[in-house]
Amino acid sequence: MGSHRDLPAGMVNHIFTNSGISSFTEFVGSYAPDLLPGRNETLAAPVGDRIPHATTIVAATCAGGVVMAGDRRATSGNIISQRDMEKVFRTDDYSCMGIAGTASTGIEMARLYRVELEHYEKMEGRTLSVAGKANRLATMIRGNLGMAMQGLVVVPLFAAYDPEIDGGRIFGYDVGGGPYEQQQYHSIGSGSIFARGSLKKLYRENASPEEVVLTLIHALYDAADDDSATGGPDVTRKIWPVVAQITADGFHRLSDEEVGGHVQTVLQERMSSPDGPVAPLR
């Protein structure tokens, strides 16, 4: 078969609707692989820190669901390239993903993944299971391995509500795919080691969504306190973390007003205790 550019539009539509392929990326890979990101690109040299990188994402389960939050800073080496980048994306009504690593590649992957899930639902008449969604994302990450070896690394964090357990599930990845299911909480990005240490002390099983939101904001604050690539709450510009919660009611991104209220609670507490809440020993 010739190039997709040689086919009339009507034939392309016929192939699309009658291919029987439930994976959008597999369909494009079969008929027009050059349209997939990174498939025909070769860099003369690794890009290193010359392009913006997204940093810290945190997620934790709560009673009846899961919450994910991300800071807003993007860096190019030692330069702050963007102060209000969004790194947490809705992927369908009951799932979301956050990105760390090469920002542009991560954003492109998030958009393509959302189309992937929508395409499956249209072709099959049902949604993928949570494990199926996690595996589809792993396949996309493996597809980016060539670019990752040249420096365009993307490592996402995936979270979803699972009706089978009436609760949230979290999946981490590496550059080769995965997925690796995480229990209770997880963090990725340059500030993840500090955020995870904070979560280890502050996380409480079956806490309310509101309590988990506060826990995640504390974790991002701790990450920003020790990692220069992670942005803390920007009070002067009123730039707050992106926070999303997923329950049986679906995906809900908290408004700036809602997040701002939680941030003020955290900042007030930090004024009297700069290192944050102290976990009880007993």
Swiss-Prot record:
One GO BP annotation of this record: modification-dependent protein catabolic process
Propeptide: 1-54
Keyword Cell membrane: no
Location relative to the cell: Cytoplasm
Gene3D superfamilies per UniProt: Glutamine Phosphoribosylpyrophosphate, subunit 1, domain 1
Catalysed conversion reaction: Cleavage of peptide bonds with very broad specificity
One Gene Ontology term, aspect cellular component: cytoplasm
GO MF, one example: threonine-type endopeptidase activity
Key words of the record: Autocatalytic cleavage, Cytoplasm, Hydrolase, Protease, Proteasome, Threonine protease, Zymogen
Involved pathway(s): Protein degradation; proteasomal Pup-dependent pathway
Record-listed E.C. numbers: 3.4.25.1
Regulation: The formation of the proteasomal ATPase ARC-20S proteasome complex, likely via the docking of the C-termini of ARC into the intersubunit pockets in the alpha-rings, may trigger opening of the gate for substrate entry. Interconversion between the open-gate and close-gate conformations leads to a dynamic regulation of the 20S proteasome proteolysis activity.
Top-rank taxon, per record: Bacteria
Record: active site: 55 (nucleophile)
Family per record: Belongs to the peptidase T1B family.
Function: Component of the proteasome core, a large protease complex with broad specificity involved in protein degradation.
Quaternary structure, from the entry: The 20S proteasome core is composed of 14 alpha and 14 beta subunits that assemble into four stacked heptameric rings, resulting in a barrel-shaped structure. The two inner rings, each composed of seven catalytic beta subunits, are sandwiched by two outer rings, each composed of seven alpha subunits. The catalytic chamber with the active sites is on the inside of the barrel. Has a gated structure, the ends of the cylinder being occluded by the N-termini of the alpha-subunits. Is capped by the proteasome-associated ATPase, ARC.
Name under which the protein is recorded: Proteasome subunit beta
Organism: Streptosporangium roseum (strain ATCC 12428 / DSM 43021 / JCM 3005 / KCTC 9067 / NCIMB 10171 / NRRL 2505 / NI 9100)
Organism phylogeny: Bacteria, Bacillati, Actinomycetota, Actinomycetes, Streptosporangiales
